[in-house]
Design a protein with these regions (language model features):
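Short, small-residue-biased leader/transition segments that mark boundaries at the very start
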Residues: 1-7, 11-12
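Terminal cytosolic tails of multi-pass membrane transporters
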Residues: 312, 398-450
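Transmembrane helix-loop junctions in multi-pass membrane proteins
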Residues: 8, 78-92, 116-122, 236-244, ...
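Loop-to-helix junctions at membrane interfaces in multi-pass transport proteins
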Residues: 10, 14-21, 56, 133-277, ...
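Central hydrophobic cores of alpha-helical transmembrane segments
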Residues: 378-389, 442
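Helix-loop junctions at the membrane interface of multi-pass solute transporters
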Residues: 8-10, 35-44, 57, 74, ...
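Helix-loop-helix module between adjacent transmembrane segments
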Residues: 18-116, 191-193, 284-292, 324
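Loop-to-transmembrane helix boundary motifs in multi-pass membrane proteins
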Residues: 58-68, 303-343
Length: 450
């Protein structure tokens, strides 16, 4: 389970560390609480292949209301999510080679499309492992070398950059810009962890595992990988400011701090540019491993959940594959348009997409797996509430020309998740209870878990 492109988080320690903590806690909960039960329920609920299909089978939605709504939500937010990955690739090539951002964006998209076409889900899972290892080595090695180069001047360099509050405040987890963190700020950053239980491209891996025994081994590897990579990402943010003391990155440039560190360490300090190139491939690996999953999930929602379910019910595998490939191309093109602005914030795009998917599907999945009384009306309203809350919170100026996200300082995922969960429970209790057959399936999963 990769960390959904780490590089927006590898900026300044004081502004991102709580997000890293939230992501780690979310990863642990996802693997220990969600993975095994979702795998078992997937078998009971007709061996579902996608998240919308699982929800449809879980609640016996013969009219396919859940399927259609879930697919639309996935397509909307995955377009933004995919755009963030493509924007990362564009900025990577632009920074390293000086290539025009727009050309770099197109090149990166072409590479991702090529191997997604060639291997589909198998290629995605295989490349995930290789890319993940390369990225982890880079994340661990570069900040350690950079720290060794400035270790004797670390505190002095931090103070020299005139960071708010000085060195002591910069290194204090509870300080932000020279002032104490507000509780709502910490809570909002920790809330990133809630998103994991609603991420379709993560959950389908639990659903697709061949043997449940593999989940235990995989959970150890995934949690360990997550811990190491997030600690390294924060370390990059801490060391980066001291190491780049004569060229402190500000604004949107902070998203390229890792790239800049690699270039300087292996060209100016050590003089082994080849090794630096390998680690830059680690950044590209993170981008690729995120984008390919996003493209495939979005394409599956269109080809299987919409096309086969509503447009061509008798479609064979060959036709579905054709629709999938066409969808991948269309999604990539739209994502390129969204990411076309060189000044677009990768962190902003990731944040919006993560919040939308987490708010819409997180509560729905948790209740579907663990609450016997959950029903289809509650799940439908909950998904819509979560998705709309994020869109309204982040994009519609309601107070003095500002959005609620700006006015309150609260991350939309926290608000959307809570509202979606609350509405789901209330509507489920206020409407007809699940049928005896649905309850029997739930109890079958319970018995299987004992």
């Amino acid at each position: 389970t990769r960390n959904r492109t780490l590089f927006p988080y590898t900026t300044l320690f004081r502004s991102q560390a709580w997000i890293a903590i939230g992501l780690f806690l979310g990863t642990v909960c996802n693997w220990l609480l969600i993975s095994k039960r979702l795998r078992r329920y997937t078998i009971v609920a007709g061996n579902s292949m996608t998240l919308p299909e699982f929800l449809e089978n879980r609640f016996h939605d013969k009219k396919k209301v859940l399927l259609s709504i879930s697919s639309v939500v996935i397509i909307i937010f995955f377009l933004v999510y995919t755009a963030s990955a493509l924007a990362s690739g564009g900025k990577l090539f632009h920074t390293i080679f000086g290539i025009d951002y727009h050309i770099a964006l197109i090149i990166g998209a072409a590479v991702i499309l090529t191997y997604t076409f060639m291997g589909g889900f198998l290629a995605v899972c295989t490349t995930d492992f290789v890319q993940g290892m390369l990225m982890l080595v880079g994340l661990l090695t570069v900040p350690i070398i950079a720290f060794a180069l400035v270790s004797g001047k670390f505190a002095a360099n931090i103070d020299h950059t005139q960071v708010a509050g000085g060195y002591d405040a910069y290194m204090n987890l509870f300080m932000n810009g020279g002032r104490p963190y507000k509780f709502v700020e910490i809570l909002s950053q920790l809330a990133w962890g809630l998103g994991y239980c609603g991420m379709p491209h993560i959950l389908i891996r639990f659903m697709a595992v061949k043997d449940e025994k593999e989940l235990k081994k995989s959970s150890v590897i995934a949690i360990s990988w997550c811990f190491l990579s997030l600690v390294a990402a924060c370390f990059i943010g801490i060391v980066g400011r001291a190491y780049l003391v004569d060229n402190v990155l500000t604004g949107g440039q902070t998203e390229s701090v890792f790239i800049t560190m690699i270039e300087r360490v292996f060209t100016k300090n050590i003089g082994i540019p080849f090794v630096g190139g390998l680690f830059l491939c680690g950044i590209l690996a993170a981008i690729m491993s995120t984008a390919d999953s996003q493209l495939l999930v979005c394409a599956s929602s269109v080809s299987k959940d919409i096309y086969k379910s509503f447009i061509r019910k008798d479609a064979d595998d060959k036709r579905i594959m054709k629709v999938t490939r066409i969808t991948v191309i269309v999604v990539a093109l739209i994502a390129i348009v969204i990411a076309w602005d060189p000044e677009s914030s990768i962190m902003g795009l990731v944040s919006d997409a993560w919040a939308g998917l987490g708010s819409a599907f997180g509560p729905a999945i948790v209740l579907a797996l663990f609450w016997k009384r959950a029903n289809m009306p509650g799940t439908v309203v909950g998904i819509i509430t979560g998705g709309l809350t994020v869109l309204i919170w982040d994009y519609i100026p309601l107070m003095g020309g500002k959005t609620l996200a700006v006015t309150t300082g609260i991350y939309s995922l926290l608000t959307g998740f809570i509202l979606s969960l609350f509405v789901n429970v209330i509507v489920s209790l206020a409407t007809k209870a699940p049928s005896a057959e649905i309850v029997a399936e739930f109890e079958k999963v319970d018995a299987y878990s004992e």
